């Protein structure tokens, strides 16, 4: 050990020579804490025994004084050299404590002893009796101390006998050694300096005496002042002279300290060796004469394999003969075995010789007290070449020992006994670390016990490194240059280490087949271990434990084996972040200290040392083989038949687990070998069998998924959680398939097939349900001919049809949502066809400064990127991964939008084209992608040029920009497709399946129509026909609503030519519905019926591109049909019943209107306000009697269509003249005005809550029809649907003047109030009371506590019942310390806010009960939970309106009482069983000082929830504070929560993100599915400026909250 001697050197303060210690008298009691002297640290047993004998036995012969002197001298000397030093920490601590105790007590005892011994010679004293008594007491105490010391000595002797291995072997008992005589000034041969080199002590300069002055004439206080001043000045300034004196003293003291340390080291060496100091000095001097020869031997060291031939011919490794080994493995090549055996013998011989040379190095280092002294005497030792060689030897020796030990541990864990028989490079060497915790003794085959013991031993072995203080641990990537001959000999013959084709030796690659071993049993030796481990702990825990055991050793060996230190390209190795739940691969770059400790492998080459690469490769391969065996086991355990629905979920989970674990270990294996082996593709070529089994497991997983979805589709409620399951499995598949060869294309095709299968099964489900319903009707009709039975049967079938359409709607909605997700993830490319020569395209690309990308080995693949990406290699590699099928949407969040890649593949089809592509002269950008990416790109078939982006949302922008830049050179083939041809074809099939479902939905509606009109009418009596027609219309409306939603959603799935196809089907379905309405539904009564809402939404959602593709005749007929349908649905007020309803009797069992169907909201009353937003009753009489001028509307419609009679009554749907409008009685608004207001309200709202957001896309131009005609038709149709009347009403001249003056005055007052020039008149008198002087209300009823229902920031909430009345309440328990005034004050503030306010929409407060350490608050109990829980899935709008009104009323009540709630959110709004909304939790509320104050800055503290905070609360409004307007902002956020089911800013996880967003002026997005009134209501709530924000009283007048609270 190099630093062992230095570690034994005591601190400078205690460096006292033994001679000085013996000469000096015993020291006085040291001040606490006393640092013990090292020489007198403990009392050895010999000394103490002698002291006992001398004190007890010879007390009569010796005088007390001589006794005392002998005791003192013997103690001082024997404490130094009487016995061995303490060897254990416990012994050191005990002796140090005892020494301190004796040091403190001994001087006092001696003084007392002397006094008592001298007492007889003194004159007699008065109290002699007391003296005698004190002497007896002292002798008793002394004997007690002696007995305790003797027992301590015996214990120390036992400890020293146990630790005798630290001493030289001396027979018999430890002899008492003589005391060496050491002199600091004596020259020693073995020490660094002699007397000639001793420094001359610098004499301390004698300070000059200060000038004496007479101080008799100075007062005492002046002298004191002068002395104090002098001392202060001396403390604050140090002279240069004093600095020089201090430096001289430090140098002198440093020299003598080193001298003392060297002498102590020499004394210790002499004591350990059993010599005198002079003999030891001469021995060291003689032994050092051989150091130059040893240094030269190390510098010229080279492994001598002279006796290697004899060893090889004599016997095989581990005592097995070569002949016997060959017999054991028939067919083995002798060359292969001899190479394996030769490598092991070379390692063994090298290890012995390196170990011997390292022992010599330790021997010469032990001859010096420190390495500095050795380097001072021998410059060769300090030379860089010598240190590099020593470092290389330490590296080789430590890693070889470590890998050998880990191979043995793995053999023990896996239950393999003869490691050499299976080709593992293991030989017998000592353990590299203490065997105490490093070689666990495993018993039996209990794998769990083995791994538990292995884990505990691994913790110790991984933390303890090879204990060699000379060499720091080496992690620097090193230029590996072994001896060429040795490397060739090893690498050519050790193919088994890198391939799976050889498991029993290191022969040629075809050795295993000649040996007669089948490929099935290559890894079968791991089968027992793998089988038991998977059952007991699972694959994840198995990987974790193996990684924990092996990773440290493998990382050290890999860093030592890397051949260069070039930076690894981005994504050259797969990012293992997705496997972080298993184990995180360590890819941290070496630190600066590790880089400084580089070892040149030229030294290893010169010393002819064998490489430890074979052991490293075997250890890496063993880990991979264990996981490979897990793969094989799962493949073999696949059930033969089709798994059941109950078991398939577990099978899928196991497949996912083994796929993830296999990919993680594959990445780990590639990471370990990627820089160790010269050929990067070599490890991949060697894991072909592993890749093949991995691909088989992926196919098994796909089969399970397909079966699982098919089983779920057969369930009656298949729509529940189906989409969530598909999304989860798709996200998992996207993560893993890129790392499996060929997995991307197969995964995309599989999930496209699954989505298509869902759409097909939805159509089949619909058809089968219709057939079943029809069969049930005829079965019941045959059984009974009674009319009531037939009527009941028709009603049941109608209900069943509504449920059928509802379930089909849910299934189709989720299938479409998943299909849109697939399209978004997979369609990331646009395809172009080259319409000009290649040279022209290259010239354009050069002029646009494009850069060519080149991948080594893929020269036939032409890739170009914009010049902005030339330096962004990471983005280029991400684009290549995206082109190969990897999901890069997560990686590309921060990537520039203009990142795209041009990709084409010329192949061998055109030689001139290949030559043209080769004319690119600019320097390409070379990148090295992942191996899987290269394989995918190599096998990819690219016929044309692809433009690839990372996210499909960026494709439209990039495609347009690229088209503009190369206009005329390329033709667009596919505006959105996949880069994989297989996936592109599957997506096209998916779109065809979606279009096919449109036809099947239309056919199903026709089938229902035919079933009721043709089949059921014949069996039903005329008296029941009216009732049955009512059920018929409900079923039909449900079917049409399903069709509306599906058609609107499927449009977003289509692109390219499919959009034209869906446009035709869209318009066809619209015609079908309008024909049904005209023929089967009654005419309206001047208002739009609710059942027509979705139909009008569907008509308005027709895209202009769909209409532009229609021929002229089709467009005119469609326009006329729409005109007639809208007029028929709206009708006229109090118009006679027409059409099919002429025969309806008044006493029909159901109302004479089309009933609401399953998809209608429950509210039967729909108030349609006028576009002006006010009631028609408030309009002037002339505005009510006059319609809008007919000329404008008639001119727009007459240009394309003539007036035609309506089918029912002959009334024209064109606008009537003004004169005819006067004759319309009871008309609040003319017909066309009402039509315009309805059309203005119509907007596209998706009924599906499960669909993804609409993606922005450009509308392709279709060849049919001219652009001018299409524009005209689109304008005419929009004018027909959304035309609104002129809002300017005709007023008289006096009324107009009055109105203008009123408006002017209001504007002037508004402006003055905005500038705070004036205020406003308030009915409430001013009050400046800061507190509400209302005492806390005490409860007077008896109560009993129930269950705990919640826990908040301030306390727990329980249910509570009043014993007197039986009323259920909520009790809030708040605990506090008896003197906790802060909590009591906060609670009192909350209670004061409660008191005095009683309102149906506020949680009621009953009273309080105050105790010593707790307070009980009794409140109203709301039994239906919170609004946050109810609105998780979103609420319908009529419910949102009702709740918004009640919340606004509650806020208004609080504001009128001068209270700001400050924490309005869904969790603080409670529901009761009666349907009421109650605002509660007033813990954050504050009572305003001035009720009548109208300024916004009323509160200056910040409280509340970040997602619901107003901007002025976050920003503090530039110091102005906030007020009641903050609650209005929170109200708007609650409305958004009710609509969407999520709180505002739900996409942000942290409050600081939300606060930053709101503070920067952003508003929560207003939901699109909200009505225009709701959007307007939110716009007034979410006004950034609190002064412009509406108050609660103003919001109560808004039309959005104009609802009747007594509705159902």
UniProtKB/Swiss-Prot annotation:
> Could you tell me which InterPro entries the record lists for this protein?
Kinase-like_dom_sf, MAP_kinase_kinase_kinase, MEKK4_N, Prot_kinase_dom, Protein_kinase_ATP_BS, Ser/Thr_kinase_AS
Principal cellular location given in the protein's record: cytoplasm
Protein name per Swiss-Prot or TrEMBL: Mitogen-activated protein kinase kinase kinase 4
Q: Which GO terms describe its cellular component?
A: cytoplasm; perinuclear region of cytoplasm
Q: Which Pfam families match?
A: MEKK4_N, Pkinase
Q: Outcome of mutating residue 1413 to Q, per the record?
A: In an ovarian serous carcinoma sample; somatic mutation
Q: Please give the annotated consequence of changing residue 1372 to R.
A: Loss of activity
